[in-house]
Amino acid sequence: MTETIKLMKAHKSVRRFKEQVLPQEDLTEILTAAQMASSWKNFQSYSVIVVRSQEKKDALYELVPQEAIRQSAVFLLFVGDLNRAEKGAQLHTDTFQPQGVEGLLISSVDAALAGQNALLAAESLGYGGVIIGLVRYKSEEVAELFNLPDYTYPVFGMALGLPNEEHEVKPRLPLTQVVFEEEYQEQTVDAIEAYDRVQADYAGARATTSWSQRLAEQFGQAEPS
């Protein structure tokens, strides 16, 4: 097994950080690695906002009350960005069509790929982090806080810093439930209940709801919880 694969398999979210600065040299390495992620047609339809200011992190916390935001050495906001595409298109045409869902997917996937590269790079340097998708639930307020222009939107945030907590890698679904040969295999309730038990064994006394209950809370209503 290569060192890269070992690092990937050891991934765990970190939400508590030591009070220590993340040096610019390391941050540049992390962001450069992020930029080398795959991108649809090399459009690179995302931007990253680096947040070091405690005042700005506190303001974001008021919108998205996740303690990792305030504790982080650096908070990265990954932005789906078609504003750059608009500027480029203006060189050749008077019209710009962001393409609805397709444009949303292009920029979201580009941002996600860059984000995964960034987190992996950070972990390789000894840092930890956590993805914060709740910024989408306050997208208008977050956009205003960070002065986002037209054709941009917050996809997710990433809190980074030196870990100040230790816990085990969270068990994933069995590979046979997410990887299928040649065609899709329908999910079974028995398999989901089995994974509920695996998650319960992992969480122990910390568990308040099962994995499938959290699915119901998220997808059992029209609006996200």
Named regions from a protein language model:
Residues 1-225:
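Acidic, surface-exposed loops and disordered segments
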